[in-house]
């Protein structure tokens, strides 16, 4: 039988100590590797989450910008609609005021004399009928009498603001109405009124 010399505990500690330390070192390496993997996975997940969040923030920003642009367009469109409505009302009120005051305006009488005289002169006196606003019927008859055109038919037409339409014997019509002047000048008038009201 073999004889063991020395302290058996010390021998056991010495024999077991090396494998134990090696095992502990491997466990520590595995723990560090695991921590490193967890840390890398965390960083990767954090980076991916940050990218998703940034992407969603950018999408939200773009949507918000789109909504803002749409709202701006709607506001501008509505503002233009309101401006156009206001300008239309102002033009109508100005025409109504003109209709009320024109009978006493010497310049209006002169305008009628000039256009009726011109129409009679250009047509060689073949004026068949004159259409005018109801409130102008009397003044038109006076002007025609002054021009020696007493036999010309005069017809009052609702919707004429002022001026006259001259129908010639051969069927041609000469439109000297305020309506016609306004229609030709309306885009310019609208711009001028808008500028005066909204850009001053």
From Swiss-Prot:
Q: Which InterPro entries match?
A: ATPase_E_C, ATPase_V1_Esu
Q: Does the keyword Cell membrane apply?
A: yes
What is the purpose of this protein? Component of the A-type ATP synthase that produces ATP from ADP in the presence of a proton gradient across the membrane.
Q: Which GO terms describe its biological process?
A: proton motive force-driven plasma membrane ATP synthesis
Its membrane topology: Peripheral membrane protein
Organism per entry: Aeropyrum pernix (strain ATCC 700893 / DSM 11879 / JCM 9820 / NBRC 100138 / K1)
Question: Which family, according to the similarity comment?
Answer: Belongs to the V-ATPase E subunit family.
This protein's name:
A-type ATP synthase subunit E
Q: Known HAMAP family for this protein?
A: ATP_synth_E_arch
- Which molecular-function annotations from GO does this UniProt entry contain? ATP binding; proton-transporting ATP synthase activity, rotational mechanism; proton-transporting ATPase activity, rotational mechanism
Q: Where in the cell is it found?
A: Cell membrane
Query: Any signal peptide, and if so, which residues?
Result: none
Assigned keywords, A-Z = ATP synthesis, Cell membrane, Hydrogen ion transport, Ion transport, Membrane, Transport
Subunit notes for this chain?
Answer: Has multiple subunits with at least A(3), B(3), C, D, E, F, H, I and proteolipid K(x).
GO cellular component terms attached to this protein's record:
plasma membrane; proton-transporting two-sector ATPase complex, catalytic domain
């Amino acid at each position: 039988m073999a004889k063991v010399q020395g302290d058996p505990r010390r021998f056991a500690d010495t024999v077991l100590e090396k494998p134990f330390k090696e095992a502990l070192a491997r466990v520590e390496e595995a723990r560090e590797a695991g921590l490193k993997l967890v840390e890398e996975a965390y960083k990767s997940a954090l980076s991916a989450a940050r990218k998703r969040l940034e992407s969603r923030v950018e999408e939200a920003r773009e949507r918000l910008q789109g909504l803002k642009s749409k709202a701006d367009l709607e506001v501008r469109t509505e503002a233009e609609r309101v401006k156009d409505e206001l300008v239309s009302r102002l033009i109508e009120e100005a025409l109504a005021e003109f209709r009320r005051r024109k009978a006493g305006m010497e310049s209006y009488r002169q305008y009628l004399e000039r256009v009726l005289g011109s129409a009679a002169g250009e047509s060689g006196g073949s004026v068949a009928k004159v259409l005018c606003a109801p409130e102008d019927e009397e003044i038109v008859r006076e002007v025609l009498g002054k021009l020696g055109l007493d036999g010309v038919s005069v017809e009052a037409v609702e919707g004429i603001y002022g001026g006259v339409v001259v129908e010639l014997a051969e069927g041609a019509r000469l439109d000297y109405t305020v309506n016609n002047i306004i229609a030709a000048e309306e885009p310019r008038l609208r711009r001028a009124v808008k500028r005066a009201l909204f850009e001053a």
